[in-house]
Regions:
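Glycine-rich, low-complexity intrinsically disordered segments
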Residues: 1-162
Length: 162
């Protein structure tokens, strides 16, 4: 017969991390225009080893998911201009020149902040680059929404420091 431990059955107080307490640092993009990020995670896949009429599975290569980033687009400093400056490191539309990955890949820091402003968790996104950008919609009928920019970022990998 199992004996229950009191720490397992009684509520233990804790302070949860909340979604709206974060600060992101991306070189060239002001932190205060970063509205949100989603999609941090990975997929390890699987490798199936067949043998006669049975099989065994082992993990495959770890592949980090793309992340979605949403920015506000203020008039000044222009969020669209900040994004396009990063895009121009990937590809210059006027000349057709592509950039080296050393120039356009960036390390991004996502600091999760506690209730008193202390950093309680830190993710570092290594080798981030822009895959897609959506500069939003302009519509005469909508007078209640701020303009947003949606980005999809590819990356090499992430590190959870603490």
């Amino acid at each position: 017969m199992a004996i229950l431990n009191s720490t397992e059955i009684f509520f233990t107080e804790f302070e949860p991390k909340v979604q709206n307490r974060f600060i992101m640092s991306i070189s060239g993009i002001p932190a205060y225009i970063i509205k949100g990020i989603s999609g941090l995670g990975f997929d390890q896949g699987e490798i199936i080893l067949n043998h006669i009429n049975v099989y065994r599975k082992i993990k495959g290569k770890l592949r980090w998911n793309d992340v979605s980033l949403t920015l506000f687009d203020p008039i000044t400093p222009s969020g669209a201009q900040a994004v396009m400056e990063w895009v121009r490191l990937h590809h210059e539309s006027v000349t057709g020149r592509d950039g080296y990955s050393d120039f356009y890949k960036k390390d991004i820091t996502l600091d999760v902040v506690g209730p008193v402003g202390d950093i309680v968790s830190e993710w570092v996104i290594k080798g981030a680059f822009i895959k897609t950008v959506d500069f939003g919609e302009y519509n005469w009928d909508n007078d209640t929404a701020a303009q947003n920019i949606a980005l999809t970022l590819g990356m090499d990998y992430c590190v959870l420091n603490f």
